[in-house]
């Protein structure tokens, strides 16, 4: 079974770069406090790295 990680949005996307907003939507995050569980892949890690200042990650 693939390893999964939990990603939670902790800061607002208002006033952020359009690319960063699109990345949050790509992660499946819609609002502050929203948590999603995703398969841990290099592509996902790259997305998280881009918006690391707006999300919290749990292994």
Swiss-Prot record:
GO biological process: translation
Pfam families for the chain: Ribosomal_L30
GO molecular function annotation: structural constituent of ribosome
Keywords, alphabetical: Ribonucleoprotein, Ribosomal protein
GO cellular component: a single term: cytosolic large ribosomal subunit
The UniProt record lists the keyword Ribonucleoprotein: yes
CDD domains tied to this protein: Ribosomal_L30
HAMAP family: Ribosomal_uL30_B (MF_01371_B)
Oligomer status and interactors: Part of the 50S ribosomal subunit.
Family of the protein in this entry: Belongs to the universal ribosomal protein uL30 family.
Protein name, entry field: Large ribosomal subunit protein uL30
Name of the gene encoding the protein in the UniProt record: rpmD
